[in-house]
């Protein structure tokens, strides 16, 4: 069985109501559900939430709901724990072998049917991969450019320049270190053992396992701030 799980809670801290904000005449949380509904592989769609509005919006997509316990419905709860709990509840109910999970987020609308089906196809065709996840190339946000504040109040490299090879080959050109692929959180297609063995996965999104294939996209990202909305609108207009 192949399933999709979308997670999203009420009470966002930074951008209030981000999961249910309107983007191009649809709610943010609708886009992942539309993509999952159109997939030719997904058997069932589940929504893990404590938000009445997300439930109301999701009903028309014929999803099944997983109520979140209070300990997983606050700002300190990790996505990995919510996915693991949701997976456990589904296993208890259906007692069927789940081969692949499509993990979605209510605040990550830059996803479509093509991306989901490509991710599933990658895992079906190549057993060496633990997962396939959507990626966007953001060279302008390379770790090479990242800084942190020192105790003296000065900006210093976040990671040693030697991490990227010979520092003499690097420069201010955003492309000098090569392409920088970010897992943009639009979709993670994972084998079930990645959830079972979550602790063994790579940081920071341990549900992806260790051997991760890219689902190449562009301009994706989960929405945490209102200023991201125009970028997502642009993506949606160009990926209908």
Language model region names:
Residues 28-44:
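A short, N-terminal amphipathic alpha-helix
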Residues 55, 195-196, 229:
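A generic structural signal for short hydrophobic patches within well-formed alpha-helices
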Residues 1-16:
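N-terminal nucleotide-binding beta1-loop-alpha1 segment
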Residues 21-22, 47:
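Conserved SAM-binding loop
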Residues 201-221, 226, 230, 234-240:
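Catalytic donor-sugar/metal-binding loop of nucleotide-sugar-dependent glycosyltransferases
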Residues 42, 96-98, 126-129:
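Short, high-confidence coil segments that cap the C-terminus of an alpha-helix
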Residues 46, 52-102, 110-111, 115-118:
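Short phosphate-binding loop-to-helix
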Residues 81, 109-203, 215-216:
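Conserved core of the sugar-phosphate nucleotidyltransferase
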